[in-house]
Regions:
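Canonical Radical SAM [4Fe-4S] cluster-binding loop centered on the CxxxCxxC motif
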Residues: 1-44
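Core AdoMet radical
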Residues: 11, 29-42, 54-70, 84-100, ...
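Regulatory, intrinsically disordered low-complexity regions in eukaryotic nuclear proteins
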Residues: 31, 242-243
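Radical SAM enzyme [4Fe-4S]-AdoMet core and its adjacent flexible, acidic
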Residues: 36, 123-242, 250, 255, ...
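Hydrophobic positions in alpha-helices of CheY-like receiver
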Residues: 51, 77-81, 134-140
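Distinct, well-ordered alpha-helical segments
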Residues: 72-77, 97-110, 129-134, 155-164
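Cysteine/selenocysteine-centered motifs that mediate thiol-based redox chemistry or coordinate metal-sulfur cofactors
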Residues: 272-276
């Protein structure tokens, strides 16, 4: 399937209706997975179908939880998503008991024509068991290393950790993300007082800014052959009444924003704004 169609409409992010085995201290979704009794994959499918009728060419993001925690269910989800969407998967890239990195790669590569990118979480500090980096050589689709920088950017130790991290993934596409819990409408687009932006600028070559959206922005850098994007996004996506991200929760219920910021989606909110 071709992937060169334009994105039209807000991103639909689906929280997979099954848990992960991680316990990352910064995870804001873990509490929602403590009780899975109301989770329903079929209702999630119905929600995906409804959103596809409204926005047949938007981005669909699978997150969690851990999408790769149940590879069978993940394949069912990928099979269900209609053609015409860019599909992204957020994962820590676990390799289950009795599996190899080749097993995982073989399953995901079956969807190489459907997957636009897999964002693989790696951090300056190890929070989860990481599979060997060699897995990235096995994939037949785009991957991106995703790192939320929680450490103090003014600390010299953070600088050393970041350089070591960038060297580890030299040649890969990398996305460094600001700690969204500190971002507001007043500072999300600010770089003058952004210590992490300054640190990245010191150790990488600045290239250009990404186009600003209502609730997020980004800046592109380069270092030793790696494209490095510094991404800043608010912890909420609905600004001035305009829905930026649509959330399908594990129950199949559809919300207009993230976590405690979100309310059940009012379809009428989607027709009052001209999405591009």
């Amino acid at each position: 399937m071709k992937k060169d169609f334009p994105k039209i409409g807000p991103t639909v992010t689906m929280f997979v209706p099954y848990d992960c085995n991680n316990a990352c201290p910064f995870c804001v979704n873990k509490k929602e997975y403590r009780d899975t009794s109301s989770f329903d994959l079929n209702r999630c499918f119905q929600a995906l179908d409804l959103m596809d009728r409204i926005f047949p060419h938007n981005d669909v993001v699978l997150t969690g939880g851990e999408p790769l925690a149940e590879l069978g269910a993940l394949q069912n989800i990928l099979d269900h998503i209609a053609d015409g969407h860019h599909i992204y998967i957020n994962t820590t890239m676990p390799v289950g008991e009795g599996q190899t990195i080749q097993d995982v790669a073989d399953i995901l590569n079956k969807y190489a024509d459907r997957i636009s990118c897999i964002n693989v979480s790696r951090d300056l500090k190890h929070y989860v068991k990481e599979c060997p980096d060699e897995i990235f050589k096995l994939f037949k689709f785009r991957t991106r290393i995703n790192c939320v920088v929680f450490e103090d950017a003014k600390d010299s130790e953070t600088r050393e950790k970041l350089i070591k991290f960038l060297d580890r993934f030299q040649g890969h596409e990398i996305q460094l993300r600001a700690n969204y819990s500190y971002l507001t409408l007043e500072n999300v687009f600010d770089t003058e007082n952004d210590n992490l932006f300054k640190l990245i600028s010191e150790i990488c070559e600045y290239k250009y800014p990404l186009e600003k959206e209502r609730f997020r922005t980004g800046y592109v850098f380069e270092r030793n052959g790696s494209k490095i994007t510094y991404h800043k996004t608010l912890p909420f996506a609905k600004v001035d009444g305009v829905v930026g991200d649509i959330i399908i929760r594990q129950t199949g219920r559809i919300y207009d924003d993230w976590n405690e910021y979100g309310h059940e989606l009012n379809i009428n909110d989607l027709v009052t704004h001209q999405y591009k």
